[in-house]
């Protein structure tokens, strides 16, 4: 009996063990299948998983090799690889020095697959991996080198030079262009066969561009469009024969050698005025480039051996190319971006703002609208001071904007700032010597500002930081603005975000007081004398710079840089900047209000902001073409200059005044950051 029980117990134990083993095996298969679905991303944060997935897909798609439909590449793949055709798309490319030096890694051209190609393009648009903006940049080098073809570059791009040139910090900047299949269908433009490019001309030569396409200068930090009606003049720093803004001989000597490109003045030709250019919907830069191309074709230069292209690029040391922000604040805050990509996007936006301030400083006196101009071709930001004083509508708009800005600055002072920021010093030696004469101080201020602009455009941030600090000690608004942005991102210094915010707030306060004083004094003396052209130019320049500073203050509040994060106040500052006339702020405000990311959606206000940005050359997104419907149009008073813009700005100011009651409520707790800024007072 006991033997039978023991045998039965042994059989049951064996059966249970077998069942457990089978269940364990099935469970392992399930875990393996689940692991294959997770692809190794389990346990990671969402951003890390996205970054890892982006890297793996880049390797599978072999983004650094050229995609091609040619039968030669397919035949090479069939000969050099063994296995099924489905394994051809799984060939990985080395992405590190260890993988590059490995003898077991096979690098061959990847078979073009439409589905994988669109996945690659989507990843590139999300993560911003390729550092090229369009296909024209890809052929900049090949246009200057007639014996070099794009395919030759990829044939010589083997694993050895990957291992030598790989750098984690410059990885995304050193990637090759996206492997678009249409690159093989386009023949790159080549230079003339009878001339050979010099080593210095390879970087500056540009291909022949298609018609109605603006010329550009390739630069990592150059912005897009700042002032669409900007006209080059011989009085600015952009020309080789030009004189700097200051009367200093030392700055003249330094700035004379900054550019060798020719600059054609447009002031003598009445057909090239701002109103005519805006009516024809073309920029003055294009007209000047076309004229230079025509003159060069009629009278060829005998001194130059290389042919002169129709679009002669302007030296980057002379003046930044006019561009606008290429990425919005919402895109820079996207959770799908890695930290390094966010930092690069924010730094690029800051460089665009700095270049915009330089263009405002150098170009504003060239593009002022004529007096008593009642045409819609004149921009709202360029209306002369005389017209603003003579028109009750324009005068009331400026008074309302000044009042709204003063209310916002006082609200920031009461709720966020606990130090006296008006005593901030910028230079290494503090404020200027009081014993010096005012003329000498003015000379030194302009001298330091011109040198700071020169070194910034040469990417010499150390010298630019020092000269902007010295110029800001003499209360120069442009230099103080650039100095504050340098402090915010730690260019040539350690990052000091709170001190940077105080510098921006100080500059905004001083500019606002200057605008109020200028408008009041001009209004009182209007019966006796009229405002001269210089005063009108300075007024418009200060208006544009104040709009740019308000936009950067809104960026600080949106990101929480050096101040407590307040997205509602950030949106209010951005909308206020758009009302002053900043094109980037107008586009950003329209985007925020159309999406309802911060506050409730307001389609009418979004349409008004989008239309204002459209007047300055920034079209709304493709999905926002509804802003041009007739129900979003306003009746314009054509007795004032820029009648359509004035109608939209008036509606925006009324909306801002109705929503500014929040800023007169009980103050909140201040940000206690006295320790971080007391030694800069």
From Swiss-Prot:
Q: What does this protein do?
A: Functions as a negative regulator of mitosis. It interacts with the C-terminal of nim1, thereby inhibiting its kinase activity which phosphorylates wee1.
Q: Give the compositionally biased regions (Low complexity).
A: 92-103, 238-278
> What stretches of residues are Sel1-like repeats?
547-582, 583-618
Which GO molecular function terms does the record list? protein kinase inhibitor activity
Does the record's keyword annotation contain Ligase? no
- Could you tell me where this protein is found in the cell? Cytoplasm
Modified residue annotations for Phosphoserine: 70, 196
Q: Where is the composition biased (Basic and acidic residues)?
A: 23-37, 296-306
Arranged from A to Z, the UniProt key words for this protein are: Cell cycle, Cell division, Cytoplasm, Mitosis, Phosphoprotein, Repeat
- Which protein are we looking at? Mitosis inhibitor nif1
Q: Name one GO cellular component term.
A: cell cortex of cell tip
Main localisation, per the record?
Answer: cytoplasm
Q: Where is this region: Disordered?
A: 22-43, 80-104, 182-324
InterPro entries of this UniProt entry?
Mitotic_Regulator, Sel1-like, TPR-like_helical_dom_sf
Q: Which organism is it from?
A: Schizosaccharomyces pombe (strain 972 / ATCC 24843)
In this chain, composition skew of type Polar residues spans: 191-203
One biological process term from GO is: negative regulation of G2/M transition of mitotic cell cycle
């Amino acid at each position: 009996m006991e033997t039978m029980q023991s045998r039965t117990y042994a059989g049951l134990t064996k059966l249970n063990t077998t069942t457990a083993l089978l269940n364990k095996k099935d469970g392992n298969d399930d875990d393996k299948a689940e692991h294959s679905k997770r692809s190794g991303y389990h346990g990671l944060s969402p951003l890390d998983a996205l970054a890892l997935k982006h890297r793996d897909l880049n390797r599978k798609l072999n983004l650094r090799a050229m995609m091609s439909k040619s039968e030669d590449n397919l035949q090479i793949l069939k000969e050099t690889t063994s296995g099924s055709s489905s394994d051809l798309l799984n060939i990985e490319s080395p992405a590190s020095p260890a993988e590059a030096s490995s003898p077991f890694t096979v690098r061959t051209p990847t078979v073009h697959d439409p589905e994988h190609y669109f996945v690659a393009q989507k990843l590139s648009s999300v993560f911003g991996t390729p550092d090229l903006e369009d296909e024209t940049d890809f052929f900049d080098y090949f246009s200057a080198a007639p014996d070099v073809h794009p395919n030759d570059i990829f044939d010589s791009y083997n694993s050895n030079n990957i291992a030598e040139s790989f750098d984690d910090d410059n990885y995304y900047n050193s990637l090759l262009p996206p492997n678009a299949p249409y690159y093989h269908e386009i023949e790159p433009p080549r230079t003339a066969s009878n001339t050979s490019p010099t080593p210095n001309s390879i970087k500056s030569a540009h291909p022949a561009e298609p018609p109605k396409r603006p010329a550009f200068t390739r630069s990592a930090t150059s912005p897009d469009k700042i002032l669409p009606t900007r006209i080059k003049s011989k009085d600015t720093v952009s020309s080789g024969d030009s004189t700097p803004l200051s009367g200093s001989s030392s700055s003249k000597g330094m700035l004379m050698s900054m550019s060798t490109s020719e600059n054609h003045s447009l002031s003598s030709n009445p057909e090239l005025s701002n109103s005519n250019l805006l009516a024809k919907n073309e920029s003055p830069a294009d007209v000047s480039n076309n004229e230079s191309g025509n003159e060069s074709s009629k009278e060829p230069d005998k001194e130059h051996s290389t042919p002169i292209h129709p679009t002669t690029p302007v030296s980057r040391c002379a003046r930044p190319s006019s561009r606008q922000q290429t990425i919005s604040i919402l895109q820079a805050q996207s959770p799908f971006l890695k930290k390094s990509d966010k930092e690069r996007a924010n730094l690029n936006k800051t460089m665009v703002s700095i270049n915009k301030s330089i263009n405002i400083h150098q170009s504003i006196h060239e593009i002022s609208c004529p007096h008593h101009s009642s045409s819609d071709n004149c921009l709202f930001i360029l209306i002369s001071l005389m017209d603003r004083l003579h028109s009750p509508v324009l005068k009331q708009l400026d008074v309302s904007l000044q009042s709204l800005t003063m209310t916002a600055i006082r609200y920031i002072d009461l709720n966020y700032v606990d130090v006296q920021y008006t005593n901030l010093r910028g230079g290494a030696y503090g404020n200027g010597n009081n014993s010096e004469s005012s003329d000498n101080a003015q000379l030194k201020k302009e001298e330091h500002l011109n040198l700071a602009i020169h070194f910034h455009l040469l990417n010499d941030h150390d010298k630019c930081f020092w000269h902007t600090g010295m110029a800001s000690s003499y209360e120069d608004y442009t230099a103080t603005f650039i100095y504050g942005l340098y402090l915010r991102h730690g260019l040539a210094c350690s990052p000091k975000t709170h001190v940077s915010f105080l510098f921006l707030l100080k500059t905004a306060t001083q500019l606002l007081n200057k605008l109020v004083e200028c408008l009041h004094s001009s209004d009182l003396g209007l019966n006796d004398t009229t405002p001269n052209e210089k005063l009108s130019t300075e007024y418009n320049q200060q208006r544009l710079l104040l709009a740019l500073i308000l936009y950067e203050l809104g960026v600080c509040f949106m990101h929480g840089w050096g101040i407590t994060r307040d997205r509602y106040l950030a949106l209010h500052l951005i909308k206020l900047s758009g009302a002053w006339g900043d094109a980037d702020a107008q586009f950003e405000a329209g985007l925020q209000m159309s999406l309802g990311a911060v506050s409730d959606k307001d389609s009418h206000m979004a349409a008004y902001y989008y239309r204002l940005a459209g007047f300055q050359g920034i079209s709304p997104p493709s999905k926002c073409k509804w802003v041009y419907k007739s129900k979003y149009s306003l009746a314009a008073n054509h007795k004032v200059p820029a009648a359509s813009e004035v109608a939209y700005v008036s509606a925006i100011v009324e909306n801002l005044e109705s929503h500014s009651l929040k800023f007169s409520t009980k103050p909140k707790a201040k940000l206690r950051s006295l320790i971080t800024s007391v030694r800069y007072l």
